[in-house]
Amino acid sequence: MRLVLLGPPGSGKGTQATRLKDTFEIPHISTGDLLRAEVAAGSPLGLKAKEVMARGDLVSDDILLGMLEARLGQADVAKGFILDGYPRNVAQANALCALLSKIGQPLDAVVQLDVASELLVERIAGRAKAEGREDDNPESVRKRLQVYTDSTAPVIGFYEQRGKLTRVDGVGSLDEVLERIRKALGR
């Protein structure tokens, strides 16, 4: 199973990716985790990323794709993977499609977790309050959700046009959402 998990901040995609990893016994690949690991390891890509981040810039698609290509070349992805946090825009979706074609590992499915914006604001604000993060006020959360909507809506369309997208209701208990994802994937 080769799967991309999409969803706005607060939709539970990281939590569900971890649960799916255990269910399907395939690795959960988070581009954020990859980036931190490469920087910590001091790899050539990690050094490039560190330099970019030190300037306060976003890490380029090329650097992220290089890290992802290296990760997808590891033995533990032979049975599949769950990709979380990538792609975030259509250029990344095209690059991922080309990479997976090159390595003979096309995607099986893309799951979009749907959760209403107001519930996302409540979830993130509640989580931020519990963690003592005062910068996650409802207005800043709404702005982050708008950025997600603006950049990711075209990605959803990209996969929808290719017949890969499945939308899943992300509201409910962890078990209920996991069961919906499993059913949507035919598992």
Swiss-Prot record:
One of its GO terms (biological process) is AMP salvage. CDD domains: ADK. GO terms for cellular component: cytoplasm. Catalyzes the reversible transfer of the terminal phosphate group between ATP and AMP. Plays an important role in cellular energy homeostasis and in adenine nucleotide metabolism. Pathway: Purine metabolism; AMP biosynthesis via salvage pathway; AMP from ADP: step 1/1. Keywords: ATP-binding, Cytoplasm, Kinase, Nucleotide biosynthesis, Nucleotide-binding, Transferase. Its EC number is 2.7.4.3. This is Adenylate kinase. Its main location: cytoplasm. ATP binds at G10, S11, G12, K13, G14, T15, R127, G172. InterPro entries: Adenylat/UMP-CMP_kin, Adenylat_kinase_CS, P-loop_NTPase. AMP binds at T31, R36, D57, L58, V59, G85, Y86, P87, R88, Q92, R133, R144. It catalyses: AMP + ATP = 2 ADP. It comes from Xanthomonas oryzae pv. oryzae (strain KACC10331 / KXO85). Monomer. Belongs to the adenylate kinase family. It is an enzyme of class 2 (transferase). The keyword ATP-binding applies. Residues 126-136 are annotated as: LID. The gene is adk. One of its GO terms (molecular function) is ATP binding. It is found in: Cytoplasm.
